[in-house]
């Protein structure tokens, strides 16, 4: 385990150095993301998904699904594509414009267009980034971006051919440059001790862990609300502190002491 960490450390340090150079280049070009202190957000990701589904039901609710029975593979593909294009034309005729922001968790660049996943407080949303839509300079900057960077995106909602609700970006703004390297997407944080000591990373990488903390917070909030309504007083009684103490209990060292300088 230790040898593996040592082997990975130089690579991580090199990536951090590259990211710092990217930040410096942005600052030298007058595009310092840390100068942006406010970004107008109209919707969270869950709201974007909900309003599009409602709008889609309103416009396409009575439209039957495409019938491919009796068609060969090529004909079926053409029929499905034609149906998608018709549905897309109907939806695009009355677009829903949104503005949202979040951390980029995934990016796939494909020439003149790219896809990325943006995670915010309420979930994740795919964004379609096109050079023709946002401009060559903005697209070139986006291609240089890293996983973990925080973006603000303005555009309209649509559904891809694979059925995923996405946002077609018309404007993209880098709000914060991530200098630290997030764990690898598919394996995440494999070190259990690191998960507990660096909860902020665990919450970024694992939505299910975040969901657990959200539920815990709501439960504690309701318990406090219940007791406050009955004039109970909350008294903090820490069970683990930095100094040894407690009657005849034998002092012991913790990870807190072990990692302290």
Per-range role (PLM):
Residues 97-110:
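Structural detector for short beta-strands of small beta-barrel domains
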Residues 113-133:
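OB-fold (S1/OB) nucleic-acid-binding surfaces
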Residues 11-97:
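OB-fold nucleic-acid-binding modules
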Residues 237-254:
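Beta-rich nucleic-acid/ligand-interaction surfaces
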């Amino acid at each position: 385990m230790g040898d593996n960490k040592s082997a990975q450390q130089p690579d991580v340090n090199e990536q951090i150095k590259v990211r710092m150079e990217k930040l410096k280049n942005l600052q030298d070009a007058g595009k310092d993301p840390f100068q942006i202190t406010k970004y107008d957000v109209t919707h969270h990701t869950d709201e974007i998904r909900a309003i599009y589904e409602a709008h889609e039901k309103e416009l396409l609710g009575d439209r039957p699904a495409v019938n491919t029975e009796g068609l060969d593979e090529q004909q079926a593909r053409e029929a499905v594509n034609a149906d998608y294009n018709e549905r897309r034309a109907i939806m695009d005729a009355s677009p829903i414009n949104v503005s949202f922001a979040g951390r980029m968790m995934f990016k796939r660049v494909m020439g003149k267009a790219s896809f990325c996943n943006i995670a915010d407080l309420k979930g994740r949303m795919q964004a379609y980034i096109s050079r023709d839509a946002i401009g060559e300079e903005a697209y070139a900057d986006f291609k240089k971006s890293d996983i973990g960077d925080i973006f603000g995106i303005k555009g309209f909602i649509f559904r891809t051919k694979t059925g995923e609700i996405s946002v077609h970006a018309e404007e993209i703004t880098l709000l914060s440059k991530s200098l630290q390297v997030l764990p690898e997407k598919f394996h995440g944080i494999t070190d259990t001790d690191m998960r507990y000591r660096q909860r902020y990373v665990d919450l970024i990488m694992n939505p299910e862990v975040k969901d657990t903390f959200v539920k815990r917070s709501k439960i504690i909030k309701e318990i406090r609300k219940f007791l406050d309504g009955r004039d109970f007083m909350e008294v903090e009684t820490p069970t683990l502190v930095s100094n040894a103490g407690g009657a005849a209990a034998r002092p012991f060292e913790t990870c807190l002491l072990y990692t302290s300088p």
